[in-house]
Every structure is written in C-alpha cells, then in structure tokens.
C-alpha cells in the first residue's frame, strides 16, 4: 500500500502529524490498513527491537484509599513501530490502541511527542 504518490491517511488524533516518509508496512496506521481505535496514551520507549516491535513504559499515579496516599506505578505496553517513523529508545511517544497485531501487541506508535 505504500506506493509513491499515495495519499497519507489522517489518523484523527489531535497533536499527531503524519510522517514525511512513506512505507509499505501493512500495520502502519498512515500507509497501511491498520485502524486506530480505543485509547490513546503517552509513554517512554524503553526498548526497540529489529523486527519493528518495542516496549513503552508509562508512569501514572494511583490513590490507595486505605492509607490515603498516592503511589507511583508503571506499566509496560508492547507496541508496533511503523517503518516510516524515526523513533529511538528514550523518546516520548504517543501510542494508540488497534486490533491485535501479534499475541501481545495491540498498540501502535503514532508519533514522537515533542
């Protein structure tokens, strides 16, 4: 689907712009057939692998009602990295939920948060 001259799809998420590069990735929300639906999160890319997968770590605050205190928690989410995006480990990224791509991958990176 990543032919030259093809229009880039609008993902419909505010604050996310389409990449300037094109790709032929089937699981790209801009040039492929993958639709983004569900929740949109922000996190830090802590691991990027060669087969276009990565791990995003997200920190959030949880309120413990028994002790009336807040605590910091972390969650790690496995994501797909489209080949048209230039991301590296340590980048703050915006991810969106999609249909399951693999056994543990249901999110895709939409862009780098500046």
Curated annotation (Swiss-Prot):
Assembly and interaction partners: Part of the 30S ribosomal subunit.
Annotated organism of origin: Sulfolobus acidocaldarius (strain ATCC 33909 / DSM 639 / JCM 8929 / NBRC 15157 / NCIMB 11770)
Keyword terms of this UniProt record: Ribonucleoprotein, Ribosomal protein, RNA-binding, rRNA-binding
Matching PANTHER family: 40S RIBOSOMAL PROTEIN S11 FAMILY MEMBER (PTHR10744), 40S RIBOSOMAL PROTEIN S11-RELATED (PTHR10744:SF9)
One GO-annotated biological process of the protein: translation
Family assignment from sequence similarity: Belongs to the universal ribosomal protein uS17 family.
Record function comment: One of the primary rRNA binding proteins, it binds specifically to the 5'-end of 16S ribosomal RNA.
GO CC list: cytosolic small ribosomal subunit
InterPro entries linked: NA-bd_OB-fold, Ribosomal_uS17, Ribosomal_uS17_arc/euk, Ribosomal_uS17_archaeal
Molecular functions (GO terms): rRNA binding; structural constituent of ribosome
Protein name: Small ribosomal subunit protein uS17
